[in-house]
Regions:
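Hydrophobic anchor at the beta1->P-loop junction of P-loop NTPases
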Residues: 5
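P-loop (Walker A) phosphate-binding loop of NTP-binding proteins
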Residues: 8
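Conserved nucleotide-binding/hydrolysis micro-motifs of P-loop NTPases
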Residues: 34-36, 78, 104-109, 153-154
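Small-molecule kinase domains that catalyze NTP-dependent phosphoryl transfer to phosphate-bearing small molecules
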Residues: 116-160
Length: 166
């Protein structure tokens, strides 16, 4: 199974991924934020670097799915419908089920989380400006998805997420 988390910065994607993995061990988490710092020790957060790491996430997704692993995509807003479609097609070409989780919350909640995590989040470019930049270009995807409002209680969100994955 391929589980894709998408949403604006600060909407709780990584938090929900950690909750999922705690409830359902065995998923291999691919995080662009983690991969970026692994392959680029001093990232500049350029479009070229982003594209390189996104391509790496896609390649690794295919590799892991080919080897029977369940994969969770984290650390990517996936604001581009085309990039989300690419991940869906990687799974579809392998006849692997895909679940898309779209994380949402109030803008003030996201901005508060971003401010709280300033300097400690693996994405060094994460900030208020990035939030609004991503928001301006965020595209809907044409695939079924579960929208999770992370302003709601965590227990109900995790329950809905686990039910959606069955």
């Amino acid at each position: 199974m391929l589980v894709i988390f998408r949403g604006l910065p600060g909407t709780g994607k990584s938090y929900l991924v950690r909750q999922l993995v705690a409830a359902r061990p065995g998923f291999h988490v691919l995080s662009r934020d983690v991969l970026r710092t692994a392959v680029l020790p001093h990232p500049m957060y350029t479009a070229e670097e982003k594209s390189l790491v996104d391509d790496l996430v896609c390649s690794m997704t295919g590799f892991l799915l080919d080897h029977g692993r369940d994969v969770v995509i984290d650390g990517m807003a996936l604001s581009s419908a085309a990039r989300a479609d690419e991940l869906v097609q990687i799974a579809a070409s392998r006849k692997v089920p895909v679940r898309i989780i779209e994380c949402v919350c109030r803008q003030d909640t996201a901005l508060s989380r971003i401010a709280r995590d300033d300097g400690s989040h693996p994405a060094g470019d994460r900030g208020k400006a990035l939030y609004f930049e991503v928001k301006s270009r965020f595209q809907p995807v044409a695939h079924p998805s579960l929208t999770v409002d992370t302003d709601c209680p965590n227990e109900s969100n995790v329950s809905a997420l686990l039910e959606y994955l069955h």
